[in-house]
Amino acid sequence: MGNTNGDSAFNKRTIAAALANYIDAGSIVAGSAGLSLWVSYLKLSDTQIGLLGALSANAISAAVGALLGGFLADKVGRKAVYTNSMLVYALGICLVLFGVNFPMLLSGYIIIGLSVGADITASWTIIAENAPKKNRARHCGVAQVAWAAGAVVVLLLSVLAGDLGLLGNKIVFAHLLVIALITYILRIRLPESDAWQTKNQPEEAQAEKPAVLNKTSYFDLLKPMYLKSILFLMGVYLVWNLAAGVMGFFMPYIYQQVGGVSANMANLLQMGLFIFTGLGVALIFMPFADKYRKTVFGIAAFMAVIGWTLFLLPVEGLPILLLFIVVIGINNGAGQQANYQLWASEIFPTQYRASAQGLMFFLVRISIGIWSLFVPMIITNFGIGTMAAILLGCVTASMIIGLLFAPNTSGKSLEQIQEELYGSPQSQVKKGTESKIM
């Protein structure tokens, strides 16, 4: 749908929605950075630590939030979800800031995760629906820049406030609370998604016709015409995320093992990785993906193949790590992550767009959580080389699937893409897309 605010990707509607990614990345990094401090303060057991990790914004709570948020965004509107999610998020942050026991801390982590998951699905959807058809990649790229910025800022704040102990980590979370409240103020003043309004207004105006398209269910997404799109996107994104999940949580450890660097240097390398991610989005994906999408995807996806191959070479040390963060940063910025956001917003009809993204986000985060249980065992028993070989297979498979089956959607409106893939909305009804609410 065309954007009445102009073609600039950095307009209020896009930035307000893109801040979801800043908050997502910031929550994950802040939670990870402060974990050891909370363990010391509350004398947490291994079971309690495991619960915090499993139910954090990087795992189960975010997955469940995405599932709920996706359904609600299709049912009641994108704005209702992505606006109110900020208030829920603020509640979760306050529980962390004022937490004096484990139940308060765990509740805060869960609420943060639920709100982040719901926010991501609604925000990604509204960005694509409000973007001009010729510049959709540029607009979606703003969200990926925000993700990298969130990670870098939180890492930097964590380093600067490190000497303050737990208070320093609370300052980091407090900064996220401020961002969330600013985001809420921005969003409450903005209109609903054009595409969602267009879909629903005619149905309300024609009372004699049943509002069949408004009755959505996750079971509808199991129909062959939608399932094949989900399988394609999971082949690209979920498989790639098996590597990305390891990179996000275990890379500082791998840096120390392969490069022999200190813990502080490992954190600096991780910050460098996020910086190159932002550069990959801003300098490669945003300027070129609207016109040369498959080429951009292929080159950026191949960067991940190069990156994980480096750990199979008989060479170790800091130079290998520096080359790794450059090529993986480019991949993170212009490869599977950014293209997934774009494709997932394009290839589903309006009435299922957010639900489909919620379902896939759920599957990805749950899969990462399960996979992460086995990663330490593989590294300990078989070595980093074996893990690198497995992840090399994942990113290679993801690249091949993307190159073979990527849809031709560049420069087309969402309505045109929907009609090419599924026919007109009327024909969808005739095919039996009407269903009961989940």
Curated annotation (Swiss-Prot):
A GO term from the CC aspect: membrane
Pfam families this protein is in?
A: MFS_1
Q: In which pathway does it act?
A: Polyol metabolism; myo-inositol degradation into acetyl-CoA
Superkingdom field: Bacteria
Belongs to which family? Belongs to the major facilitator superfamily. Sugar transporter (TC 2.A.1.1) family.
- PANTHER family xref list: CARBOXYLIC ACID TRANSPORTER PROTEIN HOMOLOG
UniProt-recorded name of the protein: Minor myo-inositol transporter IolF
